[in-house]
C-alpha cells in the first residue's frame, strides 16, 4: 500500500465518521492479528474498530471488499467493491450518496454510505465512505 493510499483512507474516514479519535480506525500496516484472519489471503487496506476496540462489531476493508463482524467477531456481512461500485455510479447520477443499511447479528445497524468514484486506484478510497449511523444500541 502506498503512502498516498493511507492518506486518502484516513481523509475519507475522517470525512465520513466526523470527529472520532484516530485510534478508532487503522491502516493495513497497523492491522491487528484477528483482522488478517478475517481477510484471509486478501490484502488489508484498513479498518474500523468495534465498540470495545476489538473484533466484535469491527469492519475490515480489503482490496476486494468489506467485511463486517458481529458481536463475537464472526463475519456477519460481506460486500464486494464491484457491487459497491454499481451503487457509487447510482450515487454519481443522483448527486447524493447511496445508503446501504447493514444489520449486524446482534441487531445493531451500520449504514454504509457509498459515494461516486473519484479515480483513486484502490476501491476503498474510490467507492466507499463509511458512516456509523447507529452504533450504540439504537435502531
What are these regions, as identified by a protein language model?
Residues 6-8, 118-139:
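Terminal and domain-flanking low-complexity segments
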Residues 18-20, 31, 70, 96, ...:
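Intrinsic-disorder/low-complexity coil detector
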